[in-house]
Amino acid sequence: MPRSLKKGPFVDEKLENKIVIARNTKSSHIIKTWSRRSTVTPEMVGLTFAVHNGKKFIPVFVTENMVGHKLGEFSPTRTFYGHAGSKKSKVR
């Protein structure tokens, strides 16, 4: 169930402050964040975030297509190694 429109998108307060500072100084520094639950807003477009996946920080460059999604959607937490093969191919 999506968030109510009257509440508006959630962006962590500390992350919002970092975005304002990055926009005012026009720096190209990567913004480090643990806030995977924050929604991508139009003010974030063009900035690079280092989003924590539980083990390390994954760099995420925000584009217009990402607006409305959560930052955590772009840094996967689980590594997929592929499905198990058949036993016949393993015996040979």
Swiss-Prot record:
Gene Ontology MF terms in the entry = rRNA binding; structural constituent of ribosome
Record Gene3D superfamilies: 30s Ribosomal Protein S19, Chain A
Asked whether the UniProt record includes Magnesium among its keywords, one would answer: no
Q: What InterPro entries does its record include?
A: Ribosomal_uS19, Ribosomal_uS19_bac-type, Ribosomal_uS19_CS, Ribosomal_uS19_SF
Gene Ontology terms: biological process: ribosomal small subunit assembly; translation
Q: Pfam families annotated for this entry? A: Ribosomal_S19 (PF00203)
Q: What are the entry keywords?
A: Ribonucleoprotein, Ribosomal protein, RNA-binding, rRNA-binding
- Which cysteines are cross-linked by disulfides? none
HAMAP family recorded: Ribosomal_uS19
Query: Which family, according to UniProt?
Result: Belongs to the universal ribosomal protein uS19 family.
Tell me what this protein is called: Small ribosomal subunit protein uS19
- Which organism was this protein described from? Desulfosudis oleivorans (strain DSM 6200 / JCM 39069 / Hxd3)
